[in-house]
Amino acid sequence: MSSESGKPIAKPIRKPGYTNPALKALGIPALRLPSRNWMIFWSVLTVSIGGIAYDKYKQRQILSHATDLVKPLAEESMEVDKVPRKITVFIAPPPNDYLESSLKVWRRYVKPVLYYAGLDYELVQEDRQGIIRTNVANRIRELRKEILASTDGQPVKEPNQTVAKPSGSSTSKISSLLPFNKIIQDPAEEDDSFDPEIGKKFKENFDWRNVIGIFYTMPKPKHIISEDALTKDPILSGGVICLGRGAYKEYIAGIHEGLLGPIEKTEKTGSTEPKMTGVVEANQIESKVSESGATELVDAEKETALEEAKVQDDLKVDEENSSEDSQKFLKPFISSDQYPDLQIASELQTPNGEFIRNPNTNIPLLINQPLLVIPIPNLIGFTTIPRRIHRFYQKRFYVEDVCSSVVNCVRQTRIRPFDIAKDIDLAKDEEKDWPQNWVKQGKEKNSEWTQELVCDPRITKHMFVYEKPPKEEPESDI
């Protein structure tokens, strides 16, 4: 073995990094570039965080610019006996997902623009298919009932009777709003005497202006007029926003069902009364006990009475819940195949073929108010992760489209008639994100969302839509 082979191998000399006598005196080592692996790690981390920060920054800038465009509308003066223009908003959840996914778009990008514009809005949201369609159709059917009742000389509705308010102290004014005029000392007596109908009537007649505000000591205006009722052109009144392709489909179906369908469902439906299984079991228990001794029969009768009372209470709760659900959701009165064979409700049309305004409020019907459809992109599944990441970093472009459309809805700058050829496919790109298994099950169950959207030209010729603003230069308005 040679002497050279026994010598240790010398390590490569490290290059001295940048240093400074002052830093060296403080004990700070020389500054050197990190290794290759650390460079890769910090580069990827910086690009990832920087992309997120830039996208969030642009979203805030777009939303701020949109709100600045509509703020002058809210600064206009308005008399105390008028209410601002009202936008009706329909929100549906994405397929196989929660409603919160759609509400995020509403809270972050739509609601702020309407708020800073000083507009009123009515929010209609659904947690199951058919609620929006039922809501739209019921509005039209209720109006048809009122018009037919008024033409027949029958009273349409009982006016809300306000509670007489005695003059005097503030306690008398507040007590006049209470549903009961007596003070109940016993809690058990209070539970027994509570009437849900009185509570509902109290809620309908309750007015905060009787308790707080300037009208607490000053006379209230006799008539409240909406700005929508003062507009001569129905196109410039109100407005409808549908968040999601599903909400848009149900809105169109509800318009057709309300105008073409009957006021009441003609076909007979099965009884919706709950089964009396609990009572049958109680009767069986009673029959078995009757065969035993007399002493056991007395105890069994008490138990049976308690069980029957419990069953009756459960049945009342089930009936109340079923009635509330039935009011929110009804099966379609007509199908899309019946549209050509049906006639538009004549009580809602004028001699020249146009639709009348609501006789109670003088506000145009929903069919005459322009429509805006906002898609809700929502990808679900493990295989869609790359596309979801790409959309996450490009969300500012979606925010720009939404904000520009809502600003156009507020300012009413671009409105055109409804065109079946292209407007029937509004937000149709959203269907590409729907899970394939969900679509397959929907077709098997004859879901409303998976069916082809059908429109009647007699209906759509009275409809208008907010046209999507064209892409503009970055320095110009949205």
Swiss-Prot record:
Pfam families linked: Tim54 (PF11711)
GO BP terms: protein insertion into mitochondrial inner membrane; protein transmembrane transport
Key words, A-Z: Membrane, Mitochondrion, Mitochondrion inner membrane, Protein transport, Translocation, Transmembrane, Transmembrane helix, Transport
Positions of transmembrane segments: 33-49
Membrane topology summary: Single-pass membrane protein
Mitochondrial matrix domain ranges by topology: 1-32
Mitochondrial intermembrane-facing ranges: 50-478
Compartment(s) where it occurs, according to its Swiss-Prot or TrEMBL record: Mitochondrion inner membrane
Disordered: region residues: 152-171
The protein's assembly and partners: Component of the TIM22 complex, whose core is composed of TIM18, TIM22 and TIM54, associated with the peripheral proteins MRS5/TIM12 and the 70 kDa heterohexamer composed of TIM9 and TIM10 (or TIM8 and TIM13).
Function per UniProt: Essential component of the TIM22 complex, a complex that mediates the import and insertion of multi-pass transmembrane proteins into the mitochondrial inner membrane. The TIM22 complex forms a twin-pore translocase that uses the membrane potential as external driving force. Its precise function within the TIM22 complex is unclear.
Listed name of the protein: Mitochondrial import inner membrane translocase subunit TIM54
Gene this protein is translated from: TIM54
